[in-house]
Amino acid sequence: TALNDLQIANQQLKTDMEKEQALEQQRVEFFSAASHELKTPLTILKGHLSGMLNGISGYENNTEYMERSLAVVDRMENLVKELLYVSKTEGTQKSAYKVVDFAEVFRVQLATVSDLSEEKKQHLEVNIPDRLYCEVEQVQMERAIQNILVNAIRYSPSNESIHITLSEIHGTIRGEIENTGVHVPDDALPHLFEAFYRADASRNRNTGGTGLGLY
């Protein structure tokens, strides 16, 4: 009936409005968090420069504080790059899905992080088939794999092993990256895909994470 159609239309409109409100709230929270993340390194950088320019006690070693300032700038640059990437992927650009050799994608990303694991004398135990085809958005998938690999290496102690397995079970591809270091607490798991979320903010600041790797 016309009444039922009107009720259905009203319910759909209400649902759409609630979704839009939720998205807007996410945007507000995202930019608020982004502002905070940029403000902290800027404050540190300003303190270093002010101390050196004004000859404040403790800042006599300019080389040391210039190196620290450069590290802060590097962190800010990485964060800005991540923000630009997120802005791009949340825009009007459509994802380009295509069939790729997923095993080869994994191997390429492993090669990009090999220097990092060698520095810590870690052993990567890799079990990946010769070929494994699937349809993915390659750029975003490469980024996600690299972020997980880098985190596994960063948060594992030196001289430890990291197990990497890729397999296909009943038509579903399963990738596993298991390290022997710091584990994510159970209560943090639901938040892993939130912007800027870090299970331990102080620990992640020391290792250079932005909290956008899985967003």
At which residue positions do the language-model features occur?
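Short alpha-helical segment of the dimerization/phosphotransfer core of two-component systems
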Residues: 68-76
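Conserved signal-transmission helix
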Residues: 2-26
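Primarily the dimerization/phosphotransfer
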Residues: 18-52
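Short conserved segment of the HATPase_c
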Residues: 184-196
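Short beta-strand/loop element within the Bergerat-fold HATPase_c
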Residues: 159-171
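Short helix-loop "hinge" at the ATP-lid/N-box region of the Bergerat-fold HATPase_c
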Residues: 152-153
